[in-house]
């Protein structure tokens, strides 16, 4: 089955729904991301002692990697830039970015995408919080972090056709031409690594389906208000 990848489409089969280019880039950036994250995180705590940040300037994460041209409404992004609440992230053709959130969640945004961080509440002392993002179009891959580890139901992604409720997992969604495809990557309920199983609840006013097996996928068609049903691979 040929489907869309993060950066180029269509080129990959179901088990390579995640862009290999994206994964390799993330591995190379992992150590750098950790250093940047620590500097910005503790720097932001210090800044709070000296100034009051408005909601519009609330820090939610940093840019870990960039491919091509990625912008917000007011600036072109580069590696290491801060990302704030309510900013719209726009990735152009052949472009993409990885965002590392303060709770260590990772958002990978693919080409021709528009993603907004609508809600980000995080207490680093307890790892309590809530994350809500919306995908207007394009691709978003989510690896959940400390907030979801504490409370698996605390991360939601809104799409034009419905809502994706992450339950402490890794998944990808693609919004294109009135349809949303959502893939659960894992870990599944029968994983051999001793990891807590993850799942994604995909739903709207017409119904819902639970993805709880790795590489299970479902589609919502906005024009027909219909579901493709869950498929496992």
Enumerate the language-model features and the residues they cover:
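Aromatic (phenylalanine/tyrosine) cluster motif
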Residues: 7, 16-17, 26, 37
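Bacterial N-terminal signal peptides
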Residues: 35-43
């Amino acid at each position: 089955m040929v489907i869309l990848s993060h950066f180029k489409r269509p080129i990959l089969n179901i088990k390579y729904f995640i862009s290999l280019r994206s994964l390799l880039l993330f591995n190379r950036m992992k150590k750098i991301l950790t250093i940047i994250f620590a500097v910005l995180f503790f720097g932001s705590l210090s800044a709070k002692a000296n100034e009051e940040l408005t909601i519009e300037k609330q820090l939610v994460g940093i840019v870990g990697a960039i491919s091509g041209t990625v912008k917000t409404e007011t600036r072109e992004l580069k590696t290491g830039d801060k990302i704030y609440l309510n900013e719209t992230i726009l990735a152009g053709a052949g472009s993409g970015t990885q965002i590392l959130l303060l709770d260590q969640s990772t958002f990978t945004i693919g080409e021709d995408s528009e993603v907004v961080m609508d809600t980000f509440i995080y207490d680093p002392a307890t790892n309590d919080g809530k994350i809500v993002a919306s995908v207007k179009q394009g691709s978003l891959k989510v690896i959940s972090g400390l907030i979801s580890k504490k409370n698996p139901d605390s991360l939601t992604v809104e799409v034009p056709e419905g809502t994706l409720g992450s339950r402490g997992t890794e998944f990808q969604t693609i919004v294109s031409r009135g349809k949303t495809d959502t893939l659960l990557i894992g870990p599944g309920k029968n994983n051999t690594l001793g990891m807590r199983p993850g799942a994604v609840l995909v739903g709207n006013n017409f119904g819902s389906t639970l993805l709880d097996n790795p590489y299970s996928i479902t589609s919502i068609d906005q024009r027909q208000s219909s579901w493709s049903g869950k498929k496992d691979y």
